Every structure is written in C-alpha cells, then in structure tokens.
C-alpha cells in the first residue's frame, strides 16, 4: 500500500508532497476512517480559501476499498465522493505537521512544520467562526474588456482545475502545466526570467518579462484595453494573483483548487487591497494583461 499526500497550502508555487508506504500508510488510513457525518449547514470543504486547505490523499498502490482513491482531510474532517464526515482521529493533522510527523521531511521552507501548524490553527479558527450566508452582488461599473466570471469552465475537477494556478487564471491563459513541468504557471518562466525570491520586487518584474504591464496607478479602475490583475505576496512563502472581471468584481484561483469570487471571509471582492487574503499580507501592485500579448509557461 502506498499513499501520496499533498499539503494543499500554496497558491502560486507547487504544493509539497510526501509518500507513505506499508504500515505507515495503513495507520494513516485507520486514523482517517469516517466517523460521524457532518451536520447540514456545517462548513464545506475549505478548497476556496487562501492558506492551508487540508491534506489531499491519493491511494496510488493497493488501495483500500473502504475509501475513495482520492479524498481531502481538513480540520478533522474527511471530504470526498459522498463523504463529509469527522475522522476517527481528530488530531491527525497536528501529528502530520508535528516534529515526528511526515511534514518534518518537507524542506520547501526553513521550518515547514511550524508554518503548517500555524496555518492549521488558523483554518480551525476559521471553521469555528464559519456562518453560511448568501452573497448579493452589488452593482458596479463594468469592465468591458475583461473576461467573464465563468468558474465552471475552470472548475472541471480534472486537467484544467488541477494543472492551472492563480497566475494562469489571472492571465486567462490555460497551460495545463502547473504541478507537471518545471516552471509551469510560474511568472517569468516563459521568458527565461523566472523570479528568484518570493517578494514583490522579484515576482513583479518576472511577470512583466512575460508581457504583463505594470499599472500601479490603476487604483482598481478598469483599463481601456486588456484587463486588470493584482499581485500579492506571502513574504518568503508564496505569491498569489487576482483578476478583475467584466462585472467589476474580482476573482481568483488558489493553486489547483476551484476558481472563486470570495475572499477568506467569504465576502465578494470589490478591491483586493481590502480583501481578507490570509497569509498574503503584502499587496504589491496592479498590472494589465493585454490579450494575445503575453505568454505563460
């Protein structure tokens, strides 16, 4: 038996993965066995938020028939086809992220375990405060050159969703390369000038080398041509992009997860500068995407 476990936590860069074999894999599956069904109206799978969104578990060899081949564990619950339950061991994620857990082997950050534990705590706090509510879209000036907000086109649960990230979505440029090839969906990779640090000063120029146009004075106004995007940074950790739609509101795609038009508080996004962006605390700049004049790797 072998499991591939992806820590779904980044938006721009690929998420880290670990693999478990044999007894470790069997023990993990014992701990994630569905226990009690979640109540109707409970928080759904947290795919749409920025920051930690759970563990994506793939059974890649000798799968257990009691569980789907792929499922998500988040904040002590399991989500999958016809699954929305608490798990047998509600402390599983804390163990996974701890110094003796599999996350200790992840080296994408200097202290990934501590970072993951902090993010896990924030997700649980978000879950406890969650209150489902309906969104009413206010009337806003239209951006006639901007793409329509069509989440169903991107959210296919397959190739388009899994292998295009926030940069692909912001640029409205499908490549199907994210997580598959070096530089897939990364600013500057197509032009040979990929960023070398996760800062505004590094990621912004990398995007400009791909053909985006710096537009810091846009102040959330629709450009006369092309469409407006915005770059934000989790310093030293990750980057994220938003795009302004034809309805004047913003939307985004956190990594391989579905496209959404709400922020981490579940609110519509009239301005990304004031949205709840989670760990992406640095608002860098606005840029303009001229259709047909950019390239994404």
Descriptions of predicted regions:
Residues 1-134:
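Function-determining sites in protein domains
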Residues 28-38, 169-176, 206, 210, ...:
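Structured segments of extracytoplasmic/periplasmic soluble domains
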Residues 37-39, 65, 177-181, 237-243, ...:
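Substrate-binding/catalytic groove segments of enzymes
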Residues 51-53, 166, 226, 238, ...:
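Residues that flank catalytic or metal-binding motifs in active/ligand-binding sites
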Residues 54-62, 89, 229, 254, ...:
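N-terminal nucleophile
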Residues 103-131, 246-297:
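Active-site or metal-binding loop neighborhoods of secreted/extracellular toxin and effector enzymes
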Residues 190-257:
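...with weaker cross-activation on analogous glycine-rich loops/strands in unrelated enzymes
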């Amino acid at each position: 038996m072998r499991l591939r476990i992806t820590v779904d936590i980044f938006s721009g860069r690929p998420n880290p993965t670990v693999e478990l074999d044999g007894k470790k894999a069997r023990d993990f599956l014992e701990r994630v066995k569905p226990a009690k069904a979640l109540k109707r109206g409970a928080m759904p799978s947290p795919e749409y938020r920025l920051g930690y969104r759970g563990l994506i578990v793939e059974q890649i060899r000798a799968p257990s028939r009691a569980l789907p081949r792929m499922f998500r564990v988040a904040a002590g619950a399991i989500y999958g086809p016809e699954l929305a339950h608490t798990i047998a061991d509600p402390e599983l994620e804390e163990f996974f992220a701890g110094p003796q857990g599999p996350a200790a082997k992840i080296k994408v950050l200097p202290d990934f375990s501590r970072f993951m534990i902090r993010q896990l705590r924030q997700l649980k706090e978000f879950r406890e405060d969650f209150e489902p509510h309906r969104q009413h879209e206010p009337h806003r000036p239209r951006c006639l050159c901007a793409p329509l907000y069509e989440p169903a086109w991107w959210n296919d649960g397959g190739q388009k969703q899994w292998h295009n990230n926030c940069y692909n979505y912001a640029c409205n440029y499908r490549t199907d390369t994210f997580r598959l090839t070096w530089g897939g969906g990364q600013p500057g990779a197509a032009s040979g000038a990929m960023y070398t640090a996760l800062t505004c000063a590094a990621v912004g120029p990398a995007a400009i080398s791909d053909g985006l146009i710096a537009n810091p004075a846009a102040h959330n106004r629709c450009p006369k041509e092309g469409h407006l995007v915005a770059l934000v940074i989790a310093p030293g950790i990750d980057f994220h992009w938003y795009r302004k739609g034809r309805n004047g509101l913003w939307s985004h795609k956190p990594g391989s997860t579905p496209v959404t038009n709400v922020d981490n508080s579940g609110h519509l996004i009239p301005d990304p500068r004031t949205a709840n962006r989670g760990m992406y605390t640095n608002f860098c700049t606005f840029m303009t995407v001229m259709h047909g004049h950019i390239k994404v790797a």
